[in-house]
Amino acid sequence: MEKPRGTEETPSSEPMEEEEDDDLELFGGYDSFRSYNSSAGSESSSYLEESSEAENEDREAGELPTSPLHLFSSANNRALDGSGSEPAVCEMCGIVGTREAFFSKTKRFCSVSCSRSYSSNSKKASILARLQGKPPTKKAKVLHKAAWSAKIGAFLHAQGTGQLADGTPTGQDALVLGFDWGKFLKDHSYKAAPVGCFKHVPLYDQWEDVMKGMKVEVLNSDAVLPSRVYWIATVIQAAGYRVLLRYEGFENDASHDFWCNLGTVDVHPIGWCAINSKILVPPRTIHAKFTDWKSYLMKRLVGSRTLPADFHIKMVESMKYPFRQGMRLEVVDKTQVSRTRMAVVDTVIGGRLRLLYEDGDSDDDFWCHMWSPLIHPVGWSRRVGHGIKMSERRCDMSHHPTFRKIYCDAVPYLFKKVRAVYTEGGWFEEGMKLEAIDPLNLGNICVATICKVLLDGYLMICVDGGPSTDGSDWFCYHASSHAIFPATFCQKNDIELTPPKGYETQPFDWESYLEKTKSKAAPARLFNMDCPNHGFKVGMKLEAVDLMEPRLICVATVKRVVHRLLSIHFDGWDNEYDQWVDCESPDIYPVGWCELTGYQLQPPVSAEPNTPQKGKDATKKKKKQFGKKRKRIPSAKTRPLRQSSKKPLLEDNLEALGVSEPVPDDIIAVCVKEEHQDLPSPDRSPSPLLPLPTESIKQERDS
């Protein structure tokens, strides 16, 4: 029966909701984007809100807010340090701040951009509702639905291109200039530190699921079909985020093995092709090796392991960082470590922050991790009694894009919490002696003195015999820091202790030194000496920040392990550039982290990584961390800024594997009859058993 005009059925939300439920069922009911851009008071949704052009320009690559509902609940349980402001959640982007710093009288939005974007979405939603005959609403509705794979792909592959203002390549540009970890590890038989050793990186607590022998579905680069096809591969070796894969069918032939980063969207659990109607095609090199690929795969897959179905979803969730461009905070002054300065977040890449000093030039920056002990919320210095540089005249930075986006101070609970201290029964006192890592020469552990005791467990420490007499070289450590040690720590652990300047007696003797200086050593019970089972071993490879030039991340080796203390050696550099770091330092990363986040990795400066460079640069006088720094790459001023555009994903993968663009050939794809087989399931398994995606297997044969 024909319906009267004007009474046609309008699209309702019910089919869309059913479709969403179906999507979630495929992945265990988990959708990492359900709360991505939702407001605190709106319903949870897996849709993406349509943003205006102004908002898209404001977004920086790698800056993704955390779930606002989670932050809002956390805010209610924590008091803001030193301020009586209540927490507020932006209804557009979900960022958390203080109400007094938010935009407009209603304090609903963090910036003008968010307010306009929200208004634009509301208007579009109202127009759409009128066209569909629905009652108007004031809420900003979702206008488009994006597939979960598209969202993940956009996030993992679009980390930004080009260079930062300081000349650091990012995103695809960084990958083009990337270091070949696979060849480096294979040629020298090196071992990489496991991802589980690094508690500040994505999926560190789930990387035990990645094991030798597990099966995955990967892009088939050895096929001449016009569309993207996949094939099953086996993990031969795991090295950080990178794995050595071998296509099924090559068996013991390692000539076609290839390295791949598991964080990319071209690696999937078994069954992904069947679910997403993708074709499994054997590589051309071995397509004639078997006549019945289906039976072969069934034998190879039964009882094997694969990645969890929500592996990439959790990867994306773990790569969302609460810091955003425009947030204000306090950071150590790199020109005088005894004080802090006000700074603004300019860039966020993989949790690492590029900070711009408010009273400096547009290129006066400082790099650190968001968990670094060198950054603090606004007001921290005044509260604990630490020195801060108060600028009488603020530089005119109105032309700088970052300073035009300042909208709120970073709230205290975004920073890593320090351990609570209890001063009853004795505490650190001024004049006490101890041993500490020199922040201006990170390869040395020196004799040091407590110069001032601050509030909340913070201590101002100076190296004995230092050049400064005005306290400008004092530095702040928390009492729970793993960079300070009781007297005789170096002696007990066979570490060379740097004595005070002018001290002639060798070896250094603490007892005679304390008697000579009429001082006492800090009690050993006051130091935090717990040692976790971190998993680091001598010789392991990793990626480490050069703290003398903290925007650089370099190929490095664990040279020595002393309890939880690691001596990091930069491959290709002299031993004088070695650095002591804690096993939980946020400045060390697993192999493949730079590739995963789109950060440029600095390769060794010589072909032999363990041979110190004998050239001019390796033997020059050592520089201070916050002073004039040595350069590993050309400076931003002398290097041209490279403009580049994003490449198609297929082209990127083919270039990475050294394969030219496939040319369509006369190939017949033969469908294989679908069969089902029940698989045994063990009692406990670190990763799921494989389904048999035989319905998606196709075979190539010559015409």
From Swiss-Prot:
InterPro entries (alphabetical): Mbt, MBT_L3MBTL2_rpt1, MBT_L3MBTL2_rpt2, PcG_chromatin_remod_factors, Znf_FCS, Znf_FCS_sf
Compartments where located: Nucleus
Segments forming FCS-type zinc fingers: 81-116
Gene3D superfamilies according to UniProt: 2.30.30.140, 3.30.60.160
Location of region: Disordered: 1-70, 604-649, 672-703
SUPFAM superfamilies the UniProt entry points to: Tudor/PWWP/MBT (SSF63748)
Covalent crosslink: Glycyl lysine isopeptide (Lys-Gly) (interchain with G-Cter in SUMO1): K698
Cross-linked residues, Glycyl lysine isopeptide (Lys-Gly) (interchain with G-Cter in SUMO2): K405, K647, K673, K698
MBT repeat intervals: 179-283, 291-391, 397-500, 508-604
Compositionally biased spans, kind Low complexity: 35-49
Ranges of Basic residues composition bias in the record: 619-634
Entry keyword annotation includes Disulfide bond: no
GO BP term (any one): negative regulation of gene expression
Biased composition range(s): Acidic residues: 15-25, 50-60
SMART domains the UniProt entry points to: MBT
Location of Phosphoserine modifications: S13, S67, S338, S681, S685, S687
Residues that bind Zn(2+): C90, C93, C110, C114
GO molecular function, one term: methylated histone binding
Main location: nucleus
Keywords tagged on the record: Chromatin regulator, Isopeptide bond, Metal-binding, Nucleus, Phosphoprotein, Repeat, Transcription, Transcription regulation, Ubl conjugation, Zinc, Zinc-finger
One GO CC annotation: nucleus
The keyword Phosphoprotein belongs to this UniProt entry's keyword annotation: yes
Pfam families from the UniProt entry: MBT (PF02820), zf-FCS_1 (PF21319)
Subunit organization: Part of the E2F6.com-1 complex in G0 phase composed of E2F6, MGA, MAX, TFDP1, CBX3, BAT8, EUHMTASE1, RING1, RNF2, MBLR, BAT8 and YAF2.
Function: Putative Polycomb group (PcG) protein. PcG proteins maintain the transcriptionally repressive state of genes, probably via a modification of chromatin, rendering it heritably changed in its expressibility. Its association with a chromatin-remodeling complex suggests that it may contribute to prevent expression of genes that trigger the cell into mitosis. Binds to monomethylated and dimethylated 'Lys-20' on histone H4. Binds histone H3 peptides that are monomethylated or dimethylated on 'Lys-4', 'Lys-9' or 'Lys-27'.
Protein name: Lethal(3)malignant brain tumor-like protein 2
Naturally occurring in which organism (per UniProt): Rattus norvegicus (Rat)
Recorded name of the encoding gene: L3mbtl2
